[in-house]
From Swiss-Prot:
Gene: lepA
HAMAP family: LepA (MF_00071)
Stated family: Belongs to the TRAFAC class translation factor GTPase superfamily. Classic translation factor GTPase family. LepA subfamily.
Name the UniProt record assigns to this protein: Elongation factor 4
Membrane topology designation: Peripheral membrane protein
Native species: Latilactobacillus sakei subsp. sakei (strain 23K) (Lactobacillus sakei subsp. sakei)
Length: 612
């Protein structure tokens, strides 16, 4: 292809993402667009084509971003090349969204005609506005009996500030308005601006590991071209490799001769060491490098930390390899080795939220065939010590002694909850129970309210989302951003089994809730720890003070079975002998803690602590 043809091709490229709240029809719209552009044969068509991970299809949510190339014959007689990057909608995966948007010039904003603008819609739109993307509003599901397109148009104009008079009315399920959306992409979304003759500059927006080809890099070419045989350099790590294959996803991998400005595709270069690549790095040519790397992405801070241990300690290295491979595909995951007296060797992992943690655990268990134990999640605390130093603690068992602490700060978030009028009371009650501070309340229209609270992150990560959904019959939507750290009266609670603290069961809680939470946890542990041959006391303690206790009764043989009547002293002698044996057993016995015991702490809901 000569220079003029390449320039012409560049004018016909359109890169766009689809952004929306969970369940507003993103993946279905992507399916219809693939169908309309004949990218997928009718016989291969299935719902949510781009959600190719088994877990995504099972849960019906998008977890990973996905990029596909489509060809569209527009009404002006020209053929356009579309690169569609599908994005997740859940708050835990907003990092995936920000990475997708950095590879685009435009975005389709999909809003449900019945539900209107929701919290996550706003959060993702602001990401798109920050990246200066051209936003095309689409009102989806207009064939629903409860659809109110005019109300939703007004909402888009009021809340987002976009002109919605030209918004496309569509139904992804029935295929209404799909052609109009494609025409809008041609006319409204600009072609990529980039210099074909400049040195290669490409942004790595995702990567994954293939056991035959090594690391596969998904890139968006910003300047220049790249072809098989080129020697490339990764600008952050400085490592150099020779390109062995280039291509695009359509939606399966299709090999190409080269990738040029505006293309979204993949390259392989026999990269065997996972540590050499990082999402957000810039690819350039080794013999003609670019002056400066692209901006890349802001480094994302994990919100939630949890210990991850293999059930079989011999699998420690397998877990390390699995985490390294998964990190290629999930840039927000962080981990470092740690050890626990109770669980042996494992890793302290950082996640963006509980759903992210759940998904990582499930992917490790499915894709790498591992059996894992996860400890209760916690956030990171800033602990000021009496000697004037400060420590950041993300593991409750590392909390210093109370006498050495001058204050503990915990992360706070600004939570915005959109909810129908009827449920405002229930939401406010829930937020206050979770130590929330009311900030403001805005009426979006006659029947919906946006309530804003400042809340501690530690109260949100457990089960706030589930409680919110059950208290509002599923109508509330929720988004949060971390605002900073505040001093709180927090205490560390140790759980003792048979008089010994189990480091993996420690947790940090506000002093006001210490007593109730301890009582609930001790009760739950009593149900999950199996009975032993000796009595097992379960205690919760703050420092040396025991604040809750329960006992798992011992199994005992009926030693009096062979005594038919007779002297009481004979019976007493047998009972004393049994008691002494149990005592000796207790002093040397150790208690196995099953995985359910760790999970019971996770699943401690408000019903357990309410009103006690």
């Amino acid at each position: 292809m000569d220079y003029a043809e390449m320039l012409d091709r560049q004018k016909h490229i359109r890169n766009f993402s689809i952004i929306a709240h969970i369940d507003h029809g993103k993946s279905t719209l992507a399916d219809r667009i693939l169908e309309m552009t004949d990218t997928i044969a009718k016989r291969d068509m299935q719902a949510q084509v781009l959600d190719d991970m088994e877990l995504e299809r099972e849960r019906g949510i998008t977890i990973k971003l996905n990029a596909v190339e489509l060809h569209y014959h527009a009404k002006d007689g020209e053929t356009y090349i579309f690169h569609l990057i599908d994005t997740p909608g859940h708050v835990d995966f907003s990092y995936e969204v920000s990475r997708s948007l950095a590879a685009c010039e435009g975005a389709l904003l999909v809003v449900d005609a019945a539900q209107g603008v929701e919290a996550q819609t706003l959060a993702n739109v602001y990401l798109a506005v920050d990246d200066d993307l051209e936003i095309v509003p689409v009102i989806n599901k207009i064939d629903l009996p409860s659809a109110q397109p005019d109300v939703v148009k007004a909402e888009i104009e009021e809340m987002i500030g976009l002109d919605a008079s030209e918004a496309v009315l569509a139904s992804a399920k029935s295929g209404i308005g799909i052609e109009e959306i494609l025409e809008k992409l041609v006319t409204d979304v600009p072609a990529p601006t980039g210099d074909l003759e400049a040195p290669l500059k490409a942004l790595i927006f995702d990567s994954n590991y293939d056991s035959y080809r090594g690391v596969v890099l998904n890139i968006r070419v910003v300047d220049g071209t790249v072809k098989v045989g080129d020697k490339i350099r990764l600008m952050n790590s400085g490592k150099e490799f020779e390109v062995t294959e280039v291509g695009v996803m359509s939606p399966k991998a299709v090999k190409r001769d080269f990738l040029m400005v505006g293309d979204v595709g993949y390259i392989t270069a026999s990269i065997k060491t996972i540590q050499d690549t990082r999402v957000g790095d810039t690819v350039t040519l080794a013999d003609n490098p670019a002056d400066a790397p692209l901006d890349g992405y802001r480094h994302i801070q994990p919100m939630v930390y949890s210990g991850m241990y293999p059930v079989d300690n011999a699998k420690f290295n397998d877990l390390r390899e699995a985490l390294e491979k998964l990190q290629l595909n999930d840039a927000a995951l962080e981990f470092e080795p740690e050890s626990s007296q109770a669980l042996g060797f494992g890793f302290r992992c950082g996640f963006l939220g509980l759903l992210h943690m759940d998904v990582v655990q499930e992917r490790l268990e499915r894709e790498f065939n591992l059996d894992l134990i996860m400890t209760a999640p916690s956030v990171d605390y800033h602990v000021a010590l009496t000697d004037g130093t400060e420590e950041v603690i993300d593991n409750p068992s590392e909390m210093p002694e109370t006498s050495n602490i001058s204050e503990v700060k915990e992360p706070y978030v600004k939570a915005s909850i959109m909810v129908p009028n009827d449920y405002v009371g229930a939401v406010m009650e829930l937020a206050q129970r979770k130590r929330g501070e009311f900030v403001t309340m805005d009426y979006l229209d006659t029947y919906r309210v946006n309530v804003i609270y400042n809340m501690p992150l530690s109260e949100i990560i457990f089960d706030f989302f589930d409680d919110l959904k059950s208290n509002t019959k599923g109508y509330a939507s929720f988004d949060y951003e971390v605002t900073g750290y505040r001093a709180s009266d927090l205490v560390k609670i140790d759980i003792l089994l048979n008089g010994e603290a189990v480091d993996a069961l420690s947790f940090i809680v506000h002093r006001d809730f210490a007593f109730e939470r301890s009582r609930v946890i001790v009760g739950k542990l009593k149900e999950t720890i199996p009975r032993q041959q000796f009595e097992v006391p379960i205690q919760a303690a703050i420092g040396n003070k025991i604040i809750a206790r329960s006992t798992v009764k011992a199994f005992r043989k009926n030693v009096l079975a062979k005594c038919y009547g007779g002297d009481i002293t004979r019976k007493r002698k047998l009972l004393e002998k049994q008691k002494a044996g149990k005592k000796r057993m207790k002093s040397v016995g150790s208690v196995e803690v099953p995985q359910e015991a760790f999970m019971s702490i996770l699943k401690m809901n408000d019903e357990d602590t309410k009103g006690k």
